[in-house]
Amino acid sequence: MKHARQAKILEIIDKEVIETQEEIADRLKKAGMEVTQATISRDIKELRLIKVMTEDGRYKYAPFNSTDNTVFNRLMTVFSKSYVSSDYANNIVVVKTLPGMAPAAASAIDSMNYPEIVGSIAGDDTVLIVCRSEKIAKEFVEKLSKLAKSDDK
């Protein structure tokens, strides 16, 4: 069921300009699949869907292609330019960003698809990242610091 639903979501966003999760739910319902907003949200994350600008200036869902270096490089640039500092406590990493930039930084971190990351939550200027262990958290802080320094601010 999950794979069929996710395949249908990919088919829908390939054929139509879909701007909201509600539109995805509506199209799935028309295809005979009842889903909740939470399920759609999880599917979007698992499918690595991102919002891209259309020619008319609207934003639509599209698959994130990890081989698309342009998008990946943009996300890494956003991260490095928004990064202020990072630290860890036990298996939790806290990333400080410029005001208003935490959601973009979290998106960049999520797009890295590190298996050692359980999940992340973004506020206004802080990203909370849950790692699988304290050792991994320490290593991840070092990775983030190197990544932020790799691009001249």
Curated annotation (Swiss-Prot):
Q: What is its main location?
A: cytoplasm
Pfam families (alphabetical): Arg_repressor, Arg_repressor_C
Instruction: Tell me which GO cellular component terms the UniProt record holds.
Output: cytoplasm
In terms of superkingdom, the source organism counts as Bacteria
GO term, biological process aspect, one = protein complex oligomerization
Note whether DNA-binding occurs among the keywords: yes
**Cellular location(s):** Cytoplasm
What keyword terms does UniProt attach to this protein?
Answer: Amino-acid biosynthesis, Arginine biosynthesis, Cytoplasm, DNA-binding, Repressor, Transcription, Transcription regulation
Question: Has the keyword rRNA-binding been applied to this entry?
Answer: no
InterPro entries referenced in this protein's UniProt entry, alphabetically: Arg_repress (IPR001669), Arg_repress_C (IPR020899), Arg_repress_C_sf (IPR036251), Arg_repress_DNA-bd (IPR020900), WH-like_DNA-bd_sf (IPR036388), WH_DNA-bd_sf (IPR036390)
Pathway annotation from the record: Amino-acid biosynthesis; L-arginine biosynthesis [regulation]
The record's annotation in HAMAP family points to:
Arg_repressor (MF_00173)
Family, according to the entry, reads as follows: Belongs to the ArgR family.
- Its biological purpose: Regulates arginine biosynthesis genes.
Q: What is this protein called?
A: Arginine repressor
Q: Which organism is it from?
A: Acetivibrio thermocellus (strain ATCC 27405 / DSM 1237 / JCM 9322 / NBRC 103400 / NCIMB 10682 / NRRL B-4536 / VPI 7372)
**Organismal lineage:** Bacteria, Bacillati, Bacillota, Clostridia, Eubacteriales
